[in-house]
């Protein structure tokens, strides 16, 4: 058959987009349930500067007392880089023009890309948890992009790992010290309570060390045995392990258990708030498919590319029990 016309290329592209999307949606994803999904349309990345405000309100002790005007205080700088992901394939002129089922070939190719897109998004999101305790950090936290250098490098915005333990406590802008992880914990009712209280009753402080609400709604674990443990802890009405069978389970319904296939950090468990505005999965560009002729050799090329990144603005959103901190 002769070379493909422009209208034929366009029709193939429509089928490829449909096949890619259908393949992507074949299996449910978790990154969009853990993170808040945000679409953006410009820039190689983004920088958000935290403003702490002027401080506490002052009680007036005399009539006519002047208002004390102060300059707003800058907090942390949060950076995100939009990473580009791509893949491509080259087809010879003969392979395309001699193939009677070219449409099927292209749809199968696009379907594999749909699966790959799902895998990469799940991997990007889960890396935040799997490598969040690494003392040297991880690339996913490095927001350096054109025009902006992330001074914290591969660590979180305050130059600490996302998940830090008591021996490596982080400081707020006001000087308070905090940690959001406890090492060497397995998932038990008592250990769940320890991490839950750490999140809601100890780390319920802002950058000025003032008391704030720090709600949690999710117990995030690996699938399999860890999920069964989680469900027994928060979904059992009576008779927790090591308790009387008629004792009421005080943990019932306090959070919802969720399992993520992509978690791999030594049976660690995480207590936090899903889809928080301070834990963002940003889509800079949706998957773009291309199918075109290469005039150099008269062959054809097909490709996919997309851009995405992670923006974290508050280490308090998720807390961790167990896992590694090397």
Regions found by a protein language model. Name each.
Residues 1-27:
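N-terminal alpha-helical "arm" segments
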Residues 56, 66, 79, 115-139, ...:
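Signature of extracytoplasmic/envelope-associated structural regions
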Residues 25-85:
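Assembly/oligomerization interface modules of large self-assembling protein complexes
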Residues 2-7, 149-209, 213-218, 223-326:
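Sequence/fold signature of self-assembling virion shell proteins
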Residues 2-10, 39-48, 66-68, 80, ...:
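Short low-complexity stretches enriched in small and charged residues
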Residues 99-108, 131-153, 206-208, 213:
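Intrinsically disordered, low-complexity coil segments
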Residues 77-137, 219-220, 300-304:
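Long, contiguous amphipathic alpha-helices that act as assembly "spine/axial" helices in icosahedral shell
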Residues 10, 18-19, 73, 204, ...:
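Short alpha-helical segments and helix-capping/turn motifs at coil-helix boundaries
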């Amino acid at each position: 058959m002769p070379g493909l016309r422009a209208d034929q290329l366009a029709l193939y592209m429509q089928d490829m987009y449909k096949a890619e999307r259908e393949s992507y949606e074949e299996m449910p994803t978790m990154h969009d349930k853990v993170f808040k999904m945000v679409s953006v349309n410009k820039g190689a990345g983004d920088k958000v500067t935290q403003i702490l405000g002027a401080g506490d309100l002052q009680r007036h002790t005399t009539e006519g007392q002047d208002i004390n005007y102060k300059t707003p205080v800058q907090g942390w700088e949060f950076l995100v880089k939009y990473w580009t992901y791509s893949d491509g394939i080259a087809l010879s002129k003969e392979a395309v023009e001699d193939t009677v089922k070219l449409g099927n070939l292209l749809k199968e190719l696009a379907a594999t890309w749909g699966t790959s897109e799902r895998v990469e998004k799940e991997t990007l999101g889960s890396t935040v948890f799997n490598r969040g305790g690494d003392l040297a950090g991880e690339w996913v936290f490095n927001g350096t992009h054109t025009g902006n250098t992330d001074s914290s490098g591969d660590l979180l915005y305050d130059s600490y790992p996302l998940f830090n333990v008591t021996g490596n406590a982080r400081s707020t802008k006001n000087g308070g010290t905090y940690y959001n992880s406890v090492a060497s914990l397995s998932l038990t009712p008592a250990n769940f309570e320890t991490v839950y209280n750490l999140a809601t009753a100890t780390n319920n402080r802002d950058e000025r060390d003032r008391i704030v609400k720090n709600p949690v709604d999710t117990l995030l674990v690996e699938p399999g045995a860890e999920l069964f443990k989680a469900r027994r802890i928060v979904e059992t009405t009576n008779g927790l392990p090591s308790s009387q069978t008629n004792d009421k389970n005080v943990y019932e319904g306090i959070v919802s258990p969720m399992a993520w296939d992509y978690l791999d950090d030594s049976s660690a468990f995480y207590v936090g708030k899903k889809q928080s505005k301070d834990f963002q999965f940003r889509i800079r560009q949706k998957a773009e498919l291309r199918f075109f002729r290469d005039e150099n050799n008269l062959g054809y090329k097909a490709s996919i590319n997309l851009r995405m990144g992670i923006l974290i603005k508050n280490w308090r959103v998720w807390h961790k029990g167990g896992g590694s901190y090397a």
